[in-house]
Amino acid sequence: MGTQRSMFIVSFLFKLFLFLSVHVRAQRTTTNFAFRGFNGNQSKIRIEGAAMIKPDGLLRLTDRKSNVTGTAFYHKPVRLLNRNSTNVTIRSFSTSFVFVIIPSSSSNKGFGFTFTLSPTPYRLNAGSAQYLGVFNKENNGDPRNHVFAVEFDTVQGSRDDNTDRIGNDIGLNYNSRTSDLQEPVVYYNNDDHNKKEDFQLESGNPIQALLEYDGATQMLNVTVYPARLGFKPTKPLISQHVPKLLEIVQEEMYVGFTASTGKGQSSAHYVMGWSFSSGGERPIADVLILSELPPPPPNKAKKEGLNSQVIVMIVALSAVMLVMLVLLFFFVMYKKRLGQEETLEDWEIDHPRRLRYRDLYVATDGFKKTGIIGTGGFGTVFKGKLPNSDPIAVKKIIPSSRQGVREFVAEIESLGKLRHKNLVNLQGWCKHKNDLLLIYDYIPNGSLDSLLYTVPRRSGAVLSWNARFQIAKGIASGLLYLHEEWEKIVIHRDVKPSNVLIDSKMNPRLGDFGLARLYERGTLSETTALVGTIGYMAPELSRNGNPSSASDVFAFGVLLLEIVCGRKPTDSGTFFLVDWVMELHANGEILSAIDPRLGSGYDGGEARLALAVGLLCCHQKPASRPSMRIVLRYLNGEENVPEIDDEWGYSKSSRSEFGSKLVGYVSSTSITRVSSTSRISQ
């Protein structure tokens, strides 16, 4: 019994010993400190060279003398390695510090400073200038250094030899003054992680630096930003996998700072506050609060060449004043000319949606070529932005005569009353000299033509089937509004992919009413001008030239087949899309017409329906074509599609004859802009 009790006591004492030893060891191997100023902490910072702790609590690494170095290390080594029977890893650690660099002058600055992991709390015989108080010419690049430094560099290149220094950058250095990785000094905007904000290390203002090393992933994050921001950017400047660090770090390392100046290139380097943590879970660097630190040093950078600068400023200001006077003269003359040129004529008073030319000139940045987003048969289209409005598209038209201006403006003003979700909205117009300007809503995704052909050719992105089918139904809805639902009948006369614009939600907008005509209900159209685009024009137009809603239906049918097949309606007069699809239909192979770029990514029922409706719309007899209301019911599945009768087709010879009659009589307009969209499938 006594023996068992003795064994129990021995076992208990042994376990207690193990627990206490592990606890003490954990405390001994964990390092945490925070210096919010260095007054009262002189014994904890080992300084060498030009470094000193000033009475105001600032740690100054160097003054602005030439060719000096300064180092400041925490007085105790930090245990950074974890060893077990299988491997060796580096413990997680983090550090944050606020520093200030004040150059001697704007042209005399350098060289920078480092945060360093070193096997010793000093850097014996370290060189100045490009060596930054860490290395010298003899040991530079020596793997026996066991030094890792994060370099804050302010000098481009070196006066002694060619180096990798790019100036105002952060670098990661392993045993060498040559950086393995360099990044120009920026911080990332928290509202837009892709937006970079640059700043200067030697600005004389406090800058916060945060370093975070995750031992589990071997990832090192480095973040720098002006301390005045008061918050930490969520995206670091450097986020780098650094397995090479394991070759550098020894069992115990010293942490601290080094700095140097060069010959004729010198800055004062200060550290206002510093915190460090290692040995626990992955630590997050503490952001130091600027108000809790000593005041920053005064920025006493010398103003060189003051007298010459004053002279230069006087000359420059005189030149600027002269230029401003000349510009003011021309501006007054320009305003005077504008006032004379914008006199209203009698016919313009009835159309109150007139915009000022000067506003459109400013909105389009002077109608520069860089603002062109498309061209068409009636003019050029520019992107613009009026104050307090969404972007606009401005079409600049040059009419052939003053009579043409009157008729065209009256026509456009009537069309400007059209309002439908599948039509491009006309906001207004302007007349300036012989130019007519039409102002539309700006549609960001460009034309259906570009999405069907240009975008796939450039990027390989193919318009998805679902997007195509919804676009087809949207165009049909817009044409139904023009033909039946507005107070007058509107015949578009130029329905084609380049006149269909796609908005940000992939809704189609039928636009470019340059050829459109209005008719009172119950009247017949009368025109002798044959207009439209080859491939989309109904066959009866070659006989009488009179457009009708049925000729718009024909053009829609061709457009619908083009959307499904991904092919142009005609090719050099040898291929006709409508005849090709009809031939496949007659052979029972109509699904072979579907755009092969879709692969299997389409709905067979919807595709078969769309092809059948397209063929019905292309019937050679206008009276046999369905109205747009019936077309929309077909596409929505609200009515069954009838069989195509034997009188549908016409021969290729008649088609060729029809095409030859059109040569020389056809105009074409389009607004084309290429843009990517999330609804385009790869």
Curated annotation (Swiss-Prot):
Active site, UniProt feature: D494
What broad class describes the main subcellular location of this protein? membrane
Q: Which GO terms describe its molecular function?
A: ATP binding; carbohydrate binding; protein serine kinase activity; protein serine/threonine kinase activity
Q: Which residues form the signal peptide?
A: 1-26
Topological domain ranges for the Cytoplasmic compartment: 332-682
Instruction: Give an example GO biological process.
Output: seed germination
Keyword ATP-binding in record: yes
**What are the alphabetically sorted keywords of the record?**
ATP-binding, Cell membrane, Kinase, Lectin, Membrane, Nucleotide-binding, Plant defense, Receptor, Serine/threonine-protein kinase, Signal, Transferase, Transmembrane, Transmembrane helix
The places in or outside the cell where this protein is found are: Cell membrane
What is the superkingdom listed in this entry's lineage?
Eukaryota
Q: In which tissues is it expressed?
A: Strongly expressed in the vascular system and trichomes of the leaves. Also expressed in guard cells, anthers, stigmas and germinating seeds, but not found in petals or roots. Increased susceptibility to the bacteria Pseudomonas syringae, characterized by stronger necrotic symptoms and higher bacterial proliferation.
Quickly give the catalysed reaction.
L-seryl-[protein] + ATP = O-phospho-L-seryl-[protein] + ADP + H(+); L-threonyl-[protein] + ATP = O-phospho-L-threonyl-[protein] + ADP + H(+)
Q: Which residues bind ATP?
A: I373, G374, T375, G376, G377, F378, G379, T380, V381, K395
Q: What is its EC number?
A: 2.7.11.1
Kindly give the membrane topology term recorded for this protein: Single-pass type I membrane protein
Q: Which residues form the Protein kinase domain?
A: 367-641
One GO cellular component term of this record is: plasma membrane
Where are the bilayer-spanning segments?
311-331
Query: How does a null allele present?
Result: Slight enhancement in abscisic acid-inhibited germination. Redundant with LECRKA4.2 and LECRKA4.3.
Using the UniProt annotation, give all residue ranges assigned to the region (Legume-lectin like): 29-277
- Reported function: Involved in negative regulation of abscisic acid response in seed germination. Involved in resistance response to the pathogenic bacteria Pseudomonas syringae.
Which family does the record assign? In the C-terminal section; belongs to the protein kinase superfamily. Ser/Thr protein kinase family.
Its recorded name reads: L-type lectin-domain containing receptor kinase VI.2
Name its species.
Arabidopsis thaliana
* Originating gene: LECRK62
